[in-house]
């Protein structure tokens, strides 16, 4: 399942995402992963969740972002939730590419039965 948190800059998308990450980290029977562009969520996200910085892996573009998601999932079958912050900054502002990316992630979600949440 894919969920999108959509809103304008400053609308509280990241704050809502952090709440969801921390809630999932407390209640999930598996592992929780949060992917963000830089290191802004370091002290906001629970230590029980795995925080990954896309910039550490030079991720730019939706194909690379999908590769990261698939690789993270392939490396750990115990992951139940994957959260992504600043999706447009990691990928691009090309909405056609965003739609294609979300379709691929939806297929990955259906195949692996994992939950994905992104801020847009």
Residue ranges and their predicted role:
Residues 1-73:
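Conserved P-loop
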Residues 27-28, 76-77, 109-112:
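A structural signal for short coil/turn segments at secondary-structure junctions
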């Amino acid at each position: 399942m894919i969920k999108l948190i959509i809103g304008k800059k400053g609308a509280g998308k990241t704050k809502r995402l952090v709440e969801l990450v921390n809630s999932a980290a407390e209640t999930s029977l598996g592992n929780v992963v949060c992917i963000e562009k830089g290191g802004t969520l370091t002290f906001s996200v629970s230590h029980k969740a795995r925080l990954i910085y896309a910039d550490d892996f030079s991720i730019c573009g939706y194909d690379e972002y999908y590769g990261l998601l698939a690789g993270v999932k392939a490396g750990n079958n115990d992951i139940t939730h994957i959260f992504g912050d600043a999706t447009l900054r990691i990928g691009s502002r090309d909405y056609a590419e965003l739609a294609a990316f979300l379709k691929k992630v939806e297929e990955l979600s259906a195949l692996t039965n994992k939950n994905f949440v992104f801020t847009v």
